[in-house]
């Protein structure tokens, strides 16, 4: 089972080598790593040229979503994954994902996510939960760094929405559920999100407003009973209330993760939990 990793890139030369090394240390026999770069002017291309196994292009694109879709179309693997430049995989992620996805009835697998700072200290553990259709219209339950999915999804023309710049991962996950693809949640961590202060997910009032608007677009795309107007302040407030009201349900889902894990019997050789990320865990030996 070949795994294709897609990395969208723009001026992240100081981090991208850790992402590349974290793919190499998986010790997985059949993989490809594709980097889609948006004409970076830092040292990104110098780093990429050090690794001849990487397939990469550096050309103008229309943003992260467009770069991802270009990479997905270039990919030749049976399983696809999306790793941002400033994040990295933990050891064992590929083998575990491949074992789970050997089930022909499954379409994707995702896990929890760890956060680390610039000093490699683990600062947060994000716990996900099993997939729920309606909840996916309000909350993103899949961390893109921790998601592996089968190529047939892209072959069926389900791609990342290019009109979204903050919630495209939420929209992609919701689209999979509403097209009845089967996803499996695992109580492990496949990857680490590096928090450096310039992340796209850093919260500001403007970005919060944009995420609400994009969330409304996702909601409108999949529900058949009501449409909200993202330009209407009352509708934006209504959507925000919906997110707040559903938080207790998310807490309940997370509380039942242990029960779900026992039911599904996916004890597939867990690797050690990392209390602290390190350069070794990102591939520097």
Functional labels for PLM-detected ranges:
Residues 1-24:
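N-proximal low-complexity "stem/linker" segments adjacent to membrane-targeting elements
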Residues 22, 29, 37-46, 60, ...:
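A conserved acidic beta->alpha catalytic loop
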Residues 59-75:
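Glycine-rich, basic loop-to-helix element that forms the pyrophosphate-binding segment
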Residues 80:
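Short aromatic/hydrophobic "clamp" motif used to bind/position activated sugar donors
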Residues 220-285:
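Membrane-proximal basic amphipathic "stem/tether" segments
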